[in-house]
Amino acid sequence: MATRLIRRSFLQLVFLTILAVSSFGTPVRAAEVTVFAAASLKNALDDAAKAYEAKSGDKVVISYAASSALAKQIEGGAPADIFFSADLDWMDYLQQKNLIDVGSRKTLLGNTLVLIAPKGSTVSLTIEKGFPLVQALGSDGKLAMADVNAVPAGKYGKAALIYLGVWDAVASRVAQAENVRAALAFVARGETPLGIVYGTDAKAEPAVRVVGTFPEDSHLKIEYPVALLASAKPEARKFFDFVVSPTAAPAFEAQGFTILSKSSLPQAAE
C-alpha cells in the first residue's frame, strides 16, 4: 500500500513538473493589430507604431491608401481593427453601416491644404480670389490632385478652388491621382508643375516646396477621425489607446499635424 502511494505521488510530481516546464517554455504570442489609414498619415503613424511595438512587443500592420478606398474595403469585409480617415465623411459612411465601434470614435488630428511645386521651381503665387493658377501651369502643365470626387484631399482641393473662383478654368488641367501621396509624387518627380496636397505631405517630401497655403475658410476644416472597427480584436484597444494619447502626440506634431482637443486626450496605459 505504501509503495503504491509513493508511486502515485511520484507520478503526480512528474506530471506537474512536465506541465510547468511546458508552460514555461511556450512563448507568449505577440498580438497583431491591423490598421487601415489615410495615405497622408504614413510618416507620422509609422513612427508612432514603431514606438508602440518597441514598448509592447506587439506587431502593428498598417495599410495606407485613400480613405475612400479603405472604407470600401472595410465594407467589403477586409480584416482590420482600426480605421484612421482623412475626413469625417468616410468615417460617417462606416458608422452608418454599423462597422465601427461608435464609442471609440475620436476626431484626433487637423491639417492644412497647400499648393506645391518642385523644389527647383521659381513659380510665385498669392492664393486669393481669382488668382492666376491656370496661367502658372503654362501651356500644357497639369495640376496634380487626389481624386476630386472621392479622396478627401481632392475634395478639399476642389472645394477650395471653387471658393476662390478658379475651378472652372483649371478643371480640365487636373491630373487626378489615387491618393494624396500619389499626387505628391507627381510634383516631386517633376511630372506636373503644381499640385495640391496637405501641409504634412509637403513637409515629408524634400523634393517639393510650398508655394502657398489655402485659406481655412476656402474648404471644410480638415479633420482626421480614428475609431476601432466593430470587429476589432480585443488586443487592438491597447494600440488605439496609445495612438490617441499624449504619448503618441509628438510623432504627429513632428510631421506638422495639429492635435485637436489635446487636453482631453487620455494618457496611454503603462
Residue ranges and their predicted role:
Residues 24-30:
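Sec/Tat signal peptide C-region and signal peptidase I cleavage site
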Residues 30-78, 85-88, 92-270:
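Exported/periplasmic ABC-transporter solute-binding proteins
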